[in-house]
Each structure stands twice: as structure tokens, then as C-alpha cells.
Regions:
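Solenoid scaffold repeats with emphasis on beta-solenoid/beta-helix
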Residues: 7, 37, 43, 50, ...
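Acidic Gly/Asp/Thr-rich repetitive segments characteristic of extracellular carbohydrate-active
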Residues: 2-51
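Beta-strand-rich solenoid/repeat architectures in extracellular/passenger domains
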Residues: 63-73, 88-106, 122-137, 152-164, ...
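Short beta-strand element of the conserved SAM-dependent methyltransferase core
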Residues: 16-19, 77, 110, 163
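Extracellular beta-strand-rich solenoid/capping regions of secreted or surface-exposed proteins
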Residues: 45-59, 68-87, 96-119, 133, ...
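Alpha-helix C-terminal capping segments
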Residues: 9-13, 27-31, 67, 135, ...
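Short, exposed beta-strand/loop patches in secreted or surface proteins that constitute
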Residues: 28-31, 87, 149
Length: 179
């Protein structure tokens, strides 16, 4: 069942039904198609994979809303193309919903993957800090396999790494800029 945050649904759903955030589905579709998307309400994308394909350019405006995501390779936002993150209203956030738990929850909330992948952060907050940050911290943005990341505005708060970059012995030209 696709539901907006304003929807009135029973507290328990019949077997076989699942409540899915309509805003999360709209976000997923918009990022896959490229262009500009402005969040209309908070969205929980846990269990969903939001991807910007290699041949697409997308802009995500948090518009003062919150995206809740998991730090797993199968969740969160993965950029293979180009993403600009901004927040036109202020107080917009992307937040981690789980503590670090080894490899299962050990990726960035946003992952930039590949030589031609790039992200520019112009505003908003990526919040991956947890209550026990020293032992159960998380990662904000992960840059892999030659991806590029530029931050010109906003902030990243993380328990361990705000921006994480790892190579895998291939020729890579990752660039991380803080402007």
C-alpha cells in the first residue's frame, strides 16, 4: 500500500500487505529518470535502493524534509551518474536509521560509485552520527571506484567518517573537494 504521511491506515495490515512511503517511491522514480525533484514530505527509504543511473543527472531538493535511510549497500542513495543535493527551506536532512553492525550496516548513506559518478552537496545535512558514535558510528558519504564529491554548502555529521574513500587497486581519479 502506497501511503503519504497524512494517510490514515489501520495500525496493523492484513498478511501480505506492506506500507510503503509514496514519497519514497516518487523519489526513487524521479532519481532514476533524472531532472529536479523537491521532497514534499519526510520519506523513509529504508529497504529501498534509490539510484541515479550512469547516464543521468539529478537534483534532489530536501525542501526542509528528512529522508531516513540505512547504511547498507542495498539501501540508501547510490550515484552512478551525477547528483546535486540542496535544501531550499533549511533543516532538510538525510539520517541513518541504524547503528553500525559490521558489514551489514557499514556503507555511506550516499554512495558515489565509478569514474564518471559525481555529487555536489550545496545544502542540507547528512546525519550519520549515532548515540554511541565511538563504537556504533556511521559513514556519511562514501566515494568508491573513482567517483568525485564536492561540498559547497550544508554539513555532514558522522560517527566515524563524514566522507569515506576506498580504492580497489584499479586506476582511479577520485576528487574530493571542500569549498
Amino acid at each position: 500500500i502506497y501511503a503519504s504521511n497524512q494517510a490514515q491506515l489501520p495500525s496493523t495490515l492484513p498478511q501480505g500487505f506492506e506500507k510503503v512511503s509514496l514519497e519514497a517511491e516518487n523519489l526513487k522514480e524521479a532519481m532514476a529518470e533524472g531532472g529536479v525533484y523537491q521532497l514534499k514530505e519526510d520519506a523513509d527509504i529504508t529497504g529501498r535502493s534509490i539510484e541515479i543511473p550512469a547516464d543521468m543527472t539529478a537534483t534532489l531538493d530536501l525542501n526542509g524534509n528528512t529522508i531516513t535511510a540505512a547504511n547498507r549497500a542495498t539501501d540508501g542513495i547510490t550515484v552512478y551518474g551525477n547528483l546535486t543535493l540542496k535544501d531550499s527551506k533549511g533543516k532538510g536532512r538525510i539520517v541513518a536509521n541504524k547503528d553500525w553492525a559490521g558489514g551489514a550496516y557499514g556503507a555511506g548513506l550516499i554512495r558515489i560509485m565509478g569514474e564518471n559518478a559525481a555529487m555536489i552537496m550545496q545544502g542540507g545535512t547528512i546525519y550519520a552520527a549515532r548515540e554511541n558514535a565511538a563504537n556504533e558510528g556511521q559513514f556519511g558519504v562514501a566515494v568508491y571506484e573513482g567517483g568525485d564529491f564536492t561540498i559547497t554548502g550544508g554539513k555532514i555529521e558522522a560517527g566515524w567518517s563524514a566522507v569515506l574513500g576506498n580504492g580497489n587497486f584499479k586506476t582511479q581519479n577520485s576528487v574530493i573537494r571542500i569549498e
